C-alpha cells in the first residue's frame, strides 16, 4: 500500500504556521517599492477601485499598478566586504568603458579619468546606490536634453545630476545620473556632508536612463562592455 507523501515545509495545520509567517514569506519574495513609486502604484489601484464594475478599466488599473511596482522596485542588495571595492551604482548593461573628463560643473579640472557607463532599460530596477563608502563633497544638477540614454552624446548633452564622494582614504568617485528619452525626472536624496556606506540607496531615475561612474586615476575596470551589472554588488573596479 502506497504511503501518502510527507509534506515538506509549513502548512496551515502546522503549529508553527501563522498569518504573520506567511506575510514574512511574501515580503521576502516580493521586493519593496521605492517611496517615489508609491503615488504611481496608488494611482493604478485607485483606477482599479473606481472601475471595479468595469472589467477593462479594472484590469487597466491593476496592470498599471503592477507595472509601476515592478519599475520602482527596491530589491535588497548585499555589497562586497573586501576593502577598496567600487560597486555598480545601478542595475543595467555596461555600455561604455573609456576615459573621459568628469562633468565640468564639479570643477575637477580637465584630467580624464576612467569611466564606466551603465544603460538602464525600462525593465531594470532604477534605484541608484553609493559606489563606495565616504562623504558626499559635491552634488550638482545640470539641465539639458532628453536624448536617448544609450547614445555617446547623452553623457555630455542630457540633463544630469553628479554626485562626488570622497572615501576615508581620500580617493574620489563620481556617479552621474543621466536622464534619457523617457527619463524626465532625476531624484537625488544625497546632500553635501552626508556620509554614505557602500550600497546605500541615494537616488532614482524615471523611466529608462544611464549612470556614468568616474573612477580614481589609476583604477582598472574589472568589467566588460555588454556585461550585466547589479547595483551595490557588481564590482566595477578597485581603489588604486
UniProtKB/Swiss-Prot annotation:
What are the entry keywords? Cell membrane, Decarboxylase, Lipid biosynthesis, Lipid metabolism, Lyase, Membrane, Phospholipid biosynthesis, Phospholipid metabolism, Pyruvate, Zymogen
Q: Key word Lipid metabolism present in the record?
A: yes
**Could you tell me what reaction this enzyme catalyses?**
a 1,2-diacyl-sn-glycero-3-phospho-L-serine + H(+) = a 1,2-diacyl-sn-glycero-3-phosphoethanolamine + CO2
Q: Does the keyword Membrane apply?
A: yes
Localization (cell): Cell membrane
Q: In which pathway does it act?
A: Phospholipid metabolism; phosphatidylethanolamine biosynthesis; phosphatidylethanolamine from CDP-diacylglycerol: step 2/2
At which residues is there a site annotated Cleavage (non-hydrolytic)?
A: 208-209
Query: Can you tell me which family this protein belongs to?
Result: Belongs to the phosphatidylserine decarboxylase family. PSD-A subfamily.
Q: How is this protein named in the record?
A: Phosphatidylserine decarboxylase proenzyme
Native organism is: Mycobacterium avium (strain 104)
Q: Which gene encodes it?
A: psd
